[in-house]
Every structure is written in C-alpha cells, then in structure tokens.
C-alpha cells in the first residue's frame, strides 16, 4: 500500500484542510493518508481550540487513515524542529510521500532553494548573527540575511509562512536521508494569518477561531467548515461551556510567573535574551493574556516567540528537558503514538508491523520515556482550567484511551 503524509494542526478542521487531504491522496496516488498532528499545544505557542481526540475524529472523518501525534517537544517549536519531528515520524512509518500546502504551489523551487542554502549556509548564519546583533527578531533576521545573499532574489519567497514550513520539510527530508518524495499544492484563497471571514467557502483557521468568539461569527463559520466540525465544536462547548484559549489559562499563567524567580524562568525553554526579566516586569500590571502579550512584544521578540515561551513556562518545560529528547542526526524516535485509524489505516500498519523499527504505541501507560512525560505534562496543563469532574475524566482518558476508529463518511451537501 502506498502512503502519503500530511503534517497538521486542525485548529479547527476546515474546508481548506478537506481540500488538502483530498489533493494529497490524489497527487500521490496513495492508498493511505497519514496525518502527523500536534497534540494540545501548537507551533505558534497556543492551546488547541479542541483536544487532540476531537481533532483526531475530525481528521478521520475528513479523509485521513492514520492519525499519529507530533510530540510536544516538536509541536511547539521553530519551523526547523517542527518539520524535523514530523518528517522523522513519516520516515519511521515508511510513508512514500509528504504533501504540504504552500503559497508557491510547485515543488521544484523548494529543491532549488535547499541546494542554494546548503551552498551559502555559513554566510547566511553569519548574516543572521549580524541582524540579531542589530536587535532584530529571529524571523526578521533570517529573512533579511536571506535577502543579502547574492542570487537569493531568484529563489522562493521565504517571507510567506507556508513556504517557510515547506522549505523545512524539504530540508528535513534531505538531512534525514529519507526516500520520502516531497509534494506541494497551492493554498487556495485564504492566507495563513487572515483573521476575517468573507464570502468564500475557504477560510483560515485564524479567522475561524476569531469568529467563534461571537454568536454571529458561529453562523458564518458554518459556511467554511464541514458539518462534522460544526457539530464537534458545538458539542464540546456544550460539555465544557468554553473553547480553550490563552485567555482562559491566563490566571494560571500569571500565578506561575508571579511565584517564579528569574533563575527559574531562565531555565525554561526559549527563555533567553532577557525574556524572563521582561516577563516578570510586565505580568504584574497585565489584566489579560492579550494585554500581557502587547506589553511583552518588541522588535526583538515576536508574538509567536513570546507565545511559545509562555507555553513552555505554563508546562514548566526546561531547556535541559527539551535538549535531552531532541534527536541527534538521523537518530530514531523512541515511539510513535497512534491516536486514530480507519480500517484501511489499520491494514497499512498490519502490513508494515514486522519491518517498522520504531514502536507504535496506543497508550502512554505502555512507555516510560522523557518525551512522553512532556506530552503528559502538556495534557495536564491544557486541562488545568477544566471543571474538576471533567478534568478527571479527560486525564484518565489520556492514559487509557485506545485509538479512535472511524471509516470515511461522505460529507452531506449543505443547503445553498
């Protein structure tokens, strides 16, 4: 059986994701789609709007055959480590291809850029340091340094978020010496960071999350997500009375900051360049998460960088812990956690069982590993603001729930 991989967050699952899954299967001529999905906290340093189990169910209904978890150590990271973790998992599962959405829309420019950057790596690193020394944020420094390289204007636009991630997927495929074939499809209509809905049936996850904050917005969201996503969001909000967000977690984050020392905050992953002192200085007067973020943000610290630091602070994840679990070179991962599958996905795993060298696990009780401990701590942190009875139920689920089984259902047509 031929397998294509996709790397996803589904925050939440929308029509653009449905298009991506359909096109990935078609372009790769694949029998099976493997979705590597972030768990409770995401790449931009924010809690997922739905727990991973609900998002796994949506992924399976949307066309994925296997859903496996991208561990916390990779999911809340810069693009390079995020991509490395995802590609490592797909390589371990012997995926034939990886299909990602990008603003570029064709794959050859990504390969050309990889070879160009390999040739100019030392010069690029030196120029990045020069830009950082001027007080630039890391993303700005990398972008400015890239533009300074002779010949860079002929290459891929790395100022676009999905092009950046796509480049790192391709880079990881080369660096890990895998046989995975990289493929890309153009992102349609909505940009990654677009924050408002329009008349299109395609919208960004950012605009959907923003719209879910109002009653009118809920009605508009129905147009840009499959019906099963709407049903899942309504069902979850009915059970909890809220959708997870940083604002919901802010009182706990504020307590964490106010009871920590600068030394403790410096030990937290991504706590560098005086970020810990700025966090302590600004938290006292902050009245909300957005207020605190506005006070924290400078030319040097991007919104995403601060959110990632906040996530690691909230989960009490240290530099030492992350550095101890990140793989070196082509070192294999300790395990792959299976969250859900269809009968076709199960057939694929059964066929590969004897040749896979990385264990595929279904419950954390079956493994004692530092990477898994970080995942469990992320779950404890995510559920910290839930009502006690629901929190107990969810945490028990985290240890004992077996993979979700769903076979694809056709999406019912909506009334015009």
Swiss-Prot record:
Signal peptide location in the record? none
Q: Where in the cell is it found?
A: Cytoplasm
- Any one GO biological process: tRNA modification
Report the SUPFAM superfamilies cross-referenced here. Nucleotidylyl transferase
Give the EC class as a word.
ligase
Example GO molecular function: tRNA binding
Which residues participate in ATP binding?
A: 7-20, 101, 162, 187-188
List, alphabetically, the GO terms of the cellular component aspect. cytoplasm
Q: Fetch the Pfam families from UniProt.
A: HIGH_NTase1
Domain of life where this protein originates: Bacteria
Keyword line: ATP-binding, Cytoplasm, Ligase, Nucleotide-binding, RNA-binding, tRNA processing, tRNA-binding
**Which InterPro entries does the record associate with it?**
Rossmann-like_a/b/a_fold, tRNA(Met)_cyd_acetate_ligase
State which Enzyme Commission number(s) the record gives: 6.3.4.-
Per its record, the protein catalyses: cytidine(34) in elongator tRNA(Met) + acetate + ATP = N(4)-acetylcytidine(34) in elongator tRNA(Met) + AMP + diphosphate
As for what it does, the entry says: Catalyzes the formation of N(4)-acetylcytidine (ac(4)C) at the wobble position of elongator tRNA(Met), using acetate and ATP as substrates. First activates an acetate ion to form acetyladenylate (Ac-AMP) and then transfers the acetyl group to tRNA to form ac(4)C34.
Q: Which PANTHER family does its entry note?
A: TRNA(MET) CYTIDINE ACETATE LIGASE
The family classification in the record reads: Belongs to the TmcAL family.
Instruction: Read off the HAMAP family from this record.
Output: TmcAL
Q: What is this protein called?
A: tRNA(Met) cytidine acetate ligase
Gene assigned in the entry: tmcAL
């Amino acid at each position: 059986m031929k397998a294509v991989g996709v790397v996803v967050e589904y925050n939440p699952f929308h029509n653009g994701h449905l298009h991506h899954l359909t096109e990935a299967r078609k372009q790769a001529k694949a029998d099976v789609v493997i979705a590597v999905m972030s768990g409770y906290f995401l790449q931009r340093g924010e809690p997922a709007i739905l727990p991973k189990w609900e998002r796994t169910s949506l992924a399976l209904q949307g066309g994925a055959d296997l859903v496996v978890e991208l561990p916390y150590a990779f999911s809340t990271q810069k693009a390079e480590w995020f991509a490395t973790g995802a590609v490592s998992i797909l390589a371990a599962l012997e995926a034939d291809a990886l299909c990602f959405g990008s603003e570029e829309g064709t794959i050859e420019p990504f390969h050309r850029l990889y070879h160009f950057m390999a040739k100019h790596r030392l010069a690029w690193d030196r120029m990045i340091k020069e830009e950082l020394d001027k007080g630039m944020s890391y993303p700005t420094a990398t972008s400015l340094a890239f533009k300074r390289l002779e010949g860079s204007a002929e290459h891929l636009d790395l100022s676009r978020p999905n092009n950046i991630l796509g480049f790192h997927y391709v880079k990881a495929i080369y660096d890990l010496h895998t046989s995975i074939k990289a493929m890309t499809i153009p992102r349609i209509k909505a940009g990654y960071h677009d924050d408002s809905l329009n008349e299109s049936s395609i919208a960004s996850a950012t605009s959907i999350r923003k719209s879910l904050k109002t009653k009118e917005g809920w009605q508009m969201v129905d147009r840009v997500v499959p019906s099963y996503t709407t049903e899942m969001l309504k069902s979850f909000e009915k059970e909890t009375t809220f959708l997870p967000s940083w604002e919901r977690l802010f009182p706990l984050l504020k307590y964490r900051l106010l009871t920590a020392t600068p030394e403790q905050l410096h030990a937290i992953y991504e706590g560098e360049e005086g970020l810990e002192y700025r966090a302590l200085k600004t938290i006292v007067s902050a009245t909300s998460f957005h207020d605190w973020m506005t006070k924290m943000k400078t030319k040097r610290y991007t919104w995403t960088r601060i959110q990632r630091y906040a996530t690691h602070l909230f989960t009490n994840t240290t530099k030492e812990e992350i550095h101890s679990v990140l793989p070196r070179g082509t070192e294999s991962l300790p395990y792959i956690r299976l969250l859900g599958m269809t009968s076709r996905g199960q057939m694929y795993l059964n066929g590969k069982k004897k040749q896979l060298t990385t264990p595929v696990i279904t419950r954390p009780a079956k493994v004692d590993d530092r990477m898994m401990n970080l995942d469990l701590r992320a779950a404890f942190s995510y559920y910290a603001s839930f009502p006690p009875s629901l929190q107990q139920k969810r945490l028990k689920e985290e240890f004992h729930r077996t993979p979700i089984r769903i076979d694809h259902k056709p999406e019912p047509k909506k009334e015009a």
